[in-house]
Design a protein with these regions (language model features):
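Conserved alpha/beta-domain cores
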Residues: 1-203, 209-211, 225
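Gly/Pro- and small hydrophobic-enriched strand-loop and loop-to-helix capping segments
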Residues: 213-228
Length: 228
């Protein structure tokens, strides 16, 4: 792994290009979300100077503190679980929320979007592994959630997101990425417009790109090991 953030970023960008090429895709169809959770502002500032433009955070309050210190420097995405009591602040802070996992949360975001006169862009998080420790709607419930969201005028669902089980080999994760894409394709056949697939992290993003990811969420490969 290169020693500097700039070197690591260039290396990740090259790996994204290579994975897209293997899949016969235009590299520009893949958006890099650099996940800065737990990273101090000084380190994030280095990443911005190196060319990072989109930052992903897991926690609303942590993001709020960082955004206050880095106003106007980046576009921010929420990639972690969102509680309904944090929804109002999330609407104000984030350009895209990756983790809508219930009708209740969708309705809450819609209400706060109306109050803020903002169309809230989001993705529906699907729990592909059926893991109780992870958030996300069940695969079987995804269409009902999308149908409910379609009736909410201040909510714009743009695709699906998933965090598959962590498995030793990226190839073992491939079937989960394939399933998310197949689910998206099925739902598009049912009339939902879902251009975005947020899937793939440091461990497995190349496989995710080969399977159709349009947003990859990469932290360690850019920022290095997280602080203890």
């Amino acid at each position: 792994m290169p020693e500097t953030i700039q070197g690591r970023l260039l290396h990740v960008q090259e790996r994204i290009r290579a994975a897209a090429a293997r899949a016969g895709r235009d590299p520009s169809s893949v958006t890099l979300v650099s996940v800065s959770k737990t990273m101090p502002v000084e380190v994030i500032r280095q990443a911005l100077e190196a060319g990072v433009t989109i930052l992903g955070e897991n926690r609303v309050q942590e993001a709020a503190d960082k955004i206050a210190e880095l106003p106007g420097r980046a576009v921010w995405h929420l990639v972690g679980h969102l509680q309904t009591n944090k929804a109002k602040q999330a609407v104000q802070l984030f350009a895209l929320i990756h983790s809508v996992d219930s009708i209740k949360l969708a309705q809450t975001l819609d209400r706060h979007g109306r109050e803020a006169r903002k169309r809230v862009r989001c993705l529906v998080e699907v729990n592909l592994g059926g893991e109780g420790s992870k958030s996300g709607t069940k695969e079987a419930d995804t269409q009902a959630l999308l149908a409910a969201a379609r009736d909410l005028p201040n909510l714009q669902v743009e695709g699906l997101m998933a965090i598959p089980p962590f498995l030793p080999s990226p190839e073992e994760v491939r079937p989960y990425f394939r399933r998310l894409r197949a689910l998206r394709d099925h739902l598009q056949g049912e009339g939902f417009r879902l251009p975005e697939l947020s899937m793939g992290m440091t461990h497995d993003f190349e496989v995710a790109i080969e399977e159709g990811a349009t947003l990859v969420r990469i932290g360690t490969a850019i920022f290095g090991p997280r602080p203890a």
